[in-house]
Amino acid sequence: MGKHDGHVHTPFCPHGTKDSFDAYCERAISLGFTSLSFTEHAPLPKGFTDPTPAQDSSIGWNELDDYIHTLSSIKKAYRDQLTIYIGLEVDFIEGFEEEICTFLNEYGPLLDDSLLSVHFLKHSDRYFCIDYSPDVFAVAIRTFGSIQAVYDTYYRTLERSITSELGPYKPKRIGHMTLVNKFQKKFPAPSTEHQKKSQLEILQLVKKHGYSLDYNGAGFIKPLCGESYPPESIAKEAVALGIPLIYGSDAHQAKALATGWEQMTPTLKNQDE
């Protein structure tokens, strides 16, 4: 495969920008990419209330068919310059596995690519979007009881996302597996040793299920993170286990394509040796 970005958002994203599909594609071509996966946030399950203050986590149900139709046209328009994959970033939400499976059974056949990501953590009957803001993360810490409890819940939920039966169209690539680190400079994991153990256990599960990892550059431009998801040390462990790493910029605007590419290329190249 040539230069590929496997995690790109779109003008359909309510918390992104209105940069057009053409803007993303032209920028990708200028950067030397040969293929892109557009992976917009899939609609949240019916019955689940978006807990974010702006309630802007995902595309609406009423927009989904238009998204797929529009991308089908873009795919044809650029077919001689860029291979475009129609995809979605699907949220794993504890307690909504059945609804997610139903959604995937309906829309999975229409997709070329997909990611499975954890953004929401469950506590009793409440959910927290742990990458929304430092303020929301702080409320989660108070609710869960400690920073460690938030980190532990994140990795436990990630584990469930990997092991859950979500049907034949379940995404086989795990999105930004260390997203809980987004605000780590303000809320560092109390025990880096404990966190690394959790991360290595996740890698073993990914390996066991034959999945791949979204090697995500967005953390490099998050001021309280400053590293990829997962960080280089864990990415190298994944390579050693034979887990495929798929680069993803997680761009929410055209100019963010290739975020982290230069820093991450050595590890990406190692898996091809």
Curated annotation (Swiss-Prot):
The gene is hisK. It comes from Halalkalibacterium halodurans (strain ATCC BAA-125 / DSM 18197 / FERM 7344 / JCM 9153 / C-125). This is Histidinol-phosphatase. Pathway: Amino-acid biosynthesis; L-histidine biosynthesis; L-histidine from 5-phospho-alpha-D-ribose 1-diphosphate: step 8/9. The keyword Cell membrane does not apply. CDD domains: PHP_HisPPase_Hisj_like. GO terms for cellular component: cytoplasm. It catalyses: L-histidinol phosphate + H2O = L-histidinol + phosphate. One of its GO terms (biological process) is L-histidine biosynthetic process.
